[in-house]
Amino acid sequence: MPGRLWCKAIFAGYKRGLRNQREHTALLKVEGVYSRNEVDFYLGKRCAYVYKAKKTTVTPGGKPNKTRVIWGKVTRAHGNSGMVRAKFTSNLPPKAIGHRIRVMLYPSRV
């Protein structure tokens, strides 16, 4: 069964007011989601920012490589156009704005 167990999303920026931004919450635009009703499926799903670093790190059960991941979770909807809010274990770096986030299709709530 080929295929991926994640949906594509873009990190649009941080949760913010007019003058202040709150870096502890990320705003994600999930591909193919255009209304608040469609967001319900993604609530509670795990998300991951996968990136490459300069130094290698040990990966569990594998060879050391340069790939790293920051894990997070979709917490709630943001607005009426299919944006979601997500909290990550450590805040996403600003260089990640506009880059791909993986929204995993687990855990299932069905």
Curated annotation (Swiss-Prot):
Domain of life: Eukaryota
Any single GO BP term: translation
Presence of keyword Metal-binding: no
Keyword Cell division: no
Record PROSITE patterns: RIBOSOMAL_L35AE
Compartment annotation: Cytoplasm
Keywords, alphabetical: Cytoplasm, Ribonucleoprotein, Ribosomal protein, RNA-binding, tRNA-binding
A molecular function (GO) term: structural constituent of ribosome
CC per GO annotation: cytoplasm; ribonucleoprotein complex; ribosome
Quaternary structure and interacting proteins, as annotated: Component of the large ribosomal subunit.
Purpose of the protein: Component of the large ribosomal subunit. The ribosome is a large ribonucleoprotein complex responsible for the synthesis of proteins in the cell.
PANTHER family reported in the protein's UniProt record: 60S RIBOSOMAL PROTEIN L35A
Family of the protein in this entry: Belongs to the eukaryotic ribosomal protein eL33 family.
Name used for this protein in its record: Large ribosomal subunit protein eL33
Species for this entry: Ictalurus punctatus
